[in-house]
Amino acid sequence: STAVRDAQQRSGVAGPINALTIDVEDYFQVSALAWYIRRDEWDTRECRVEANVDRILGLLSEHGTQATFFTLGWVAERYPEMVRRIVAQGHELASHGHGHERASDLDAAAFRADVTRAKAILEDTAGVPVHG
């Protein structure tokens, strides 16, 4: 990832220092709750993602650590400023799909459409290319 390469250059260490990734999704979007919280109910739930990401950003800043944030397109649409803060603080932005679909539940065309949609939303929101 870009974050790892940047850390290597700053430290002068040839190998990876760490590879820290963070999934940016809300509690109600995990597949374990899919039977209890339908997608059409997501917008009715209290979102905690922004407060949690801001806390993580603070901790990473405090420790001089960079990470890759795998972010849902759904989240980026609702919290564009948060996505821009992630990038502004030097972290790598990557796609976690749009609606947290399980890849095993999608055919190739649906998977491609989901990933393409999320990538476009993330790039348009953050103004940086998304490679992951």
Where are these regions (language model features)?
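Catalytic alpha-helical scaffold of carbohydrate-active enzymes acting on polysaccharides/glycoconjugates
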Residues: 1-132
